[in-house]
Amino acid sequence: MTTTASTTATTTATATTTTIDRAAPADIADLRQLYYAVYGPHYPAALGTDPAEMSRLIADPHTLWLVARCSRTGHLAGSAAIHGEPGSRIGRLEGLAVHPDHRAGGLAGTLTDALCRQRLGTGADRLDSVYATVRTVSPGPQRVVTRNGFRPLGVLPNAVDLSSRESLALYARHSPGVLDRRRPVPEVPAPLAPLLRTVALTLGTDGPEPRTTPPAPAPRGHSAARLEIVEAPAFVRRRFHERFPDATSWFYPLHTPNALLVADDGAFEVYAYLNRTGRYCALIAAHPSPATAAGYLEAITRTLTRAGTGYVEALVPLAEHGPLSAFLAQGFIPSALYPAMRPDPDGDGFHDYVVMTRTAEQIDFRGVVVDTALQPYLDAYLSAWAATYLPTLEVAP
């Protein structure tokens, strides 16, 4: 990875000069204090709370972690990272934090710009895209990423539990030319239409829209099935790699399974990333096949809810009508679309993916603050949610 030379920036609101450089192991204690000052004791990411994981990320050649240091005091004023992984050309912008004493001076934007200029440039280690999940308690974080070339792609209601349940917004920025190589999809289940129209307006695409068709019939249900959760991260990782030795047989960038859901009769296994602090879960892969587990989705989400999970998501190819229909049948909502997310094996084109979500808790949008560019995605989600959960009323003649 390209090394980062030190740069200086002046935050206009406070007239304080900061120096931006790569994070170092000696910064870990100060970084933990920074994240506590910004997020309190509820920050769910290991990047700001776990010294061992922070040390690993600082040394990771696929992660670029920058810090901003006040030139006058030497204290950390801000931090942000783009985290990647071997074999993938997707990065995640995470850990963006600016100390309360240094806000309103543009430091968040300066850090984001410095990261993106290096990881979305023209070098051999260039990423195809970088995504961010952004808080919606105020428009500030949304505007920071928007000003740095990120586009809104959806809303993820109840996605994380900080001091209370919060909704997040998905944003992404692509390297030049990537979006021009999206693979067209001939048809999609009709409930995806509001989301796809919104994404087309955001990206400014004017090509033909996919044909909308009714969702496929739901697979035979097994709602009464009994499942067990195995939370032994090292064991789950080993078993996952035994089941999926070929990396092309599954796709969920930057998520490593740490939990395993197993049917009592051994009919299937579902590998998931379960975050106990944030009380959310990502369904990553199923063995022997996603189709086998599709009929158990109700039992899977019920088991996760009983285990304290308030939000479940899955990443589904836009071209896979059957799996999308299966998730729709179990109350999952098409909440976001990641265009040009996965490259073809030959690298000629890119495939879109849909983020399907389901929350077991009441959604309260009264505390959600969205910028103008994000509002259409909130409207699209509400439309899809209403179509899923509100009955169609017929007026008697």
Model-assigned labels for residue ranges:
Residues 207-313:
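Non-catalytic interaction/regulatory modules that flank or connect domains
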Residues 131-133, 149-168, 333-347:
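Conserved catalytic-core motifs of GNAT/GCN5-like acyltransferases
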Residues 119-135, 306-316:
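Conserved GNAT acetyl-CoA-binding A-motif
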Residues 98, 104-120, 147, 290-303:
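Conserved acetyl-CoA-binding loop-helix of GNAT-fold acetyltransferases
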Residues 160-192, 343-381:
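C-terminal "cap" of GNAT-fold acetyltransferases
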Residues 15-49, 67-70, 169, 177, ...:
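Short amphipathic alpha-helix that is part of the acyltransferase structural core
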Residues 2-18:
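Compositionally biased, intrinsically disordered low-complexity segments enriched
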Residues 28, 32-100, 245-280, 286-288:
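A conserved beta-strand-loop-helix scaffold within acyl/acetyltransferase catalytic domains
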